[in-house]
Amino acid sequence: MAQLEGYYFSAALSCTFLVSCLLFSAFSRALREPYMDEIFHLPQAQRYCEGRFSLSQWDPMITTLPGLYLVSVGVVKPASWLLGWSEHVICSIGVLRFVNLLFSVGNFYLLYLLFRKVQPRNKASSSIQRILSTLTLAVFPTLYFFNFLYYTEAGSVFFTLFAYLMCLYGNHRTSALLGFCGFMFRQTNIIWAAFCAGHLIAQKCSEAWKIELQKKKEERLAPTKGPLSELRRVLQFLLVYAMSLKNLRMLFLLTWPYVLLLLAFFAFVVVNGGIVVGDRSSHEACLHFPQLFYFFSFTAFFSFPHLLSLTKVKTFLSLVWKRRVQFSVVTLVSILLVWKFTYVHKYLLADNRHYTFYVWKRVFQRHEVVKYLLVPAYIFAGWAIADSLKAKSIFWNLMFFVCLVASTVPQKLLEFRYFILPYIIYRLNIPLPPISRLVCELGCYTVVNFVTFYIFLNKTFQWPNSQDIQRFMW
């Protein structure tokens, strides 16, 4: 059975890579020059490729650290020595873009290993389910598209998933080192390095919580009723747990590689004067709480085979009626957050090359009241996401929610790329869905990818004040 699964995996990976190579060829023919953010990334990588590493050679418009460029040089330079290619060829746009295609192969393999590790292997979860889940996430539209451009997404996901895998296998020093590599691609990836530490802490808290529950059971204390009472008990338990020096010492000994990484990050922020390098004018942090609601909607859209069903809607409505006071409070708080904390970035309104421009224009700008009318849908999506993660411990859920808030809420710009990593972490940790739902999900992703690539490659346009060809993209 294991050998057969290996054949299935090899076939899925080979077919995906073949299709990706064909798409890469189409991209290379259509895009001879750097496009969008590539106008910053590609020249910087080419300077590194030529051995010009001094700070005077750094483009101040770049806001991320040089992880992508350093890895690219580490890949293409040995290739030039082995193949005898000239520097002009090895540092070309096509070769540098191909580095991300290599990252996509690594991501496919890491996703498969993560599904094998995260999901319990039993008769109920077949090899087909694991491989279909891997294939589906590997072609997740928002991530898959950027495998063909010289962006940081593919490498960022690779090192973050690798760090998560090493964490699950208990190799925490390697995990922290890989977390640092992820940070070098995108500074906010430090949150997902902290997530690995949080995973360890959640495990230990769960063990202690089980002992606590067993004591309560033996003392025959009345069980708590309702989620708020349960949450209050959990928070009280965490407070008591954190007050114990013995527990803190044990947690530090477990998580010290991540603690060192976080201390290095804080030192970087102090020395740099902020998390962003280069141009900070367009990357101002703020409390943009509706980003959580946008993530819930994004997740509900891309995971609709698992989150949307008539049964789920009926269950949700029944729960709303049963706990109408609590849901009324949640609704009022959500409306308040939408009212007071909605921010509209200048790029969202000005750049009509991104899909988010049209989502905002045709949904949110249709009428002032629309953003409030969507609140019930946000609440349903949030509940459906939480319900799909109920197999995980409450401590894991708390830790994931904290990391989700930290990675999305400070972002002023509505950008689907910011949702890639939290979505993948979420999708990895829900129970393996039935094959029929996975096939439906894969089919929908394939359609979305086809439409996205077709529009990007064929439906070009020009701005009135520019002769450059513009394209629609995520």
Swiss-Prot record:
GO terms for molecular function: dolichyl pyrophosphate Glc2Man9GlcNAc2 alpha-1,2-glucosyltransferase activity. Pathway: Protein modification; protein glycosylation. The keyword Transmembrane helix applies. It catalyses: an alpha-D-Glc-(1->3)-alpha-D-Glc-(1->3)-alpha-D-Man-(1->2)-alpha-D-Man-(1->2)-alpha-D-Man-(1->3)-[alpha-D-Man-(1->2)-alpha-D-Man-(1->3)-[alpha-D-Man-(1->2)-alpha-D-Man-(1->6)]-alpha-D-Man-(1->6)]-beta-D-Man-(1->4)-beta-D-GlcNAc-(1->4)-alpha-D-GlcNAc-diphospho-di-trans,poly-cis-dolichol + a di-trans,poly-cis-dolichyl beta-D-glucosyl phosphate = a alpha-D-Glc-(1->2)-alpha-D-Glc-(1->3)-alpha-D-Glc-(1->3)-alpha-D-Man-(1->2)-alpha-D-Man-(1->2)-alpha-D-Man-(1->3)-[alpha-D-Man-(1->2)-alpha-D-Man-(1->3)-[alpha-D-Man-(1->2)-alpha-D-Man-(1->6)]-alpha-D-Man-(1->6)]-beta-D-Man-(1->4)-beta-D-GlcNAc-(1->4)-alpha-D-GlcNAc-diphospho-di-trans,poly-cis-dolichol + a di-trans,poly-cis-dolichyl phosphate + H(+). One of its GO terms (biological process) is protein N-linked glycosylation. Residues 28-64, 119-126, 172-175, 278-283, 339-365, 414-436 are extracellular. It is an enzyme of class 2 (transferase). It is found in: Endoplasmic reticulum membrane. It comes from the Eukaryota. It is a multi-pass membrane protein. Keywords: Endoplasmic reticulum, Glycosyltransferase, Membrane, Transferase, Transmembrane, Transmembrane helix. The chain crosses the membrane at residues 7-27, 65-85, 98-118, 127-147, 151-171, 176-196, 257-277, 284-304, 318-338, 366-386, 393-413, 437-457. Its EC number is 2.4.1.256. GO terms for cellular component: endoplasmic reticulum membrane. Residues 1-6, 86-97, 148-150, 197-256, 305-317, 387-392, 458-473 are cytoplasmic. InterPro entries: Alg10. It holds the Pfam family DIE2_ALG10. Interacts with KCNH1; may regulate KCNH1, possibly by regulating its N-glycosylation. Interacts with KCNH2; may reduce KCNH2 sensitivity to classic proarrhythmic drug blockade, possibly by regulating its N-glycosylation. Belongs to the ALG10 glucosyltransferase family. Dol-P-Glc:Glc(2)Man(9)GlcNAc(2)-PP-Dol alpha-1,2-glucosyltransferase that operates in the biosynthetic pathway of dolichol-linked oligosaccharides, the glycan precursors employed in protein asparagine (N)-glycosylation. The assembly of dolichol-linked oligosaccharides begins on the cytosolic side of the endoplasmic reticulum membrane and finishes in its lumen. The sequential addition of sugars to dolichol pyrophosphate produces dolichol-linked oligosaccharides containing fourteen sugars, including two GlcNAcs, nine mannoses and three glucoses. This is Dol-P-Glc:Glc(2)Man(9)GlcNAc(2)-PP-Dol alpha-1,2-glucosyltransferase. It comes from Mus musculus.
